């Protein structure tokens, strides 16, 4: 059976991996998943990530914990294949009053809501992370 929403699967793997106190998780790789992992890493929600090349490239994400608790409190998919959510630059949401981030896919690539606001860009809201 084919996967309907690979991004939701990625977010679920991160959520489940941290709930099970895993050190690292792996999943099939794609350009969008690597871009999302890059945003999560630069914002400090995951330790690191790497793409393991092979016949089918795998994305390996090293999860981050603080005092034995997951750094990611919640991670939730917003825009999905059946209902895409797009926002203009002035409509971009602030997650937890600015404490969390919204991952946004813009014409200039995948970035946080903060970076999109500074660049005056709107786009598709991929997920919220807090």
Swiss-Prot record:
InterPro entries: Ribosomal_uS8 (IPR000630), Ribosomal_uS8_CS (IPR047863), Ribosomal_uS8_sf (IPR035987). One of its GO terms (molecular function) is rRNA binding. It holds the Pfam family Ribosomal_S8. Keywords: Ribonucleoprotein, Ribosomal protein, RNA-binding, rRNA-binding. GO terms for cellular component: ribonucleoprotein complex; ribosome. The keyword Metal-binding does not apply. Part of the 30S ribosomal subunit. Contacts proteins S5 and S12. One of the primary rRNA binding proteins, it binds directly to 16S rRNA central domain where it helps coordinate assembly of the platform of the 30S subunit. This is Small ribosomal subunit protein uS8. The gene is rpsH.
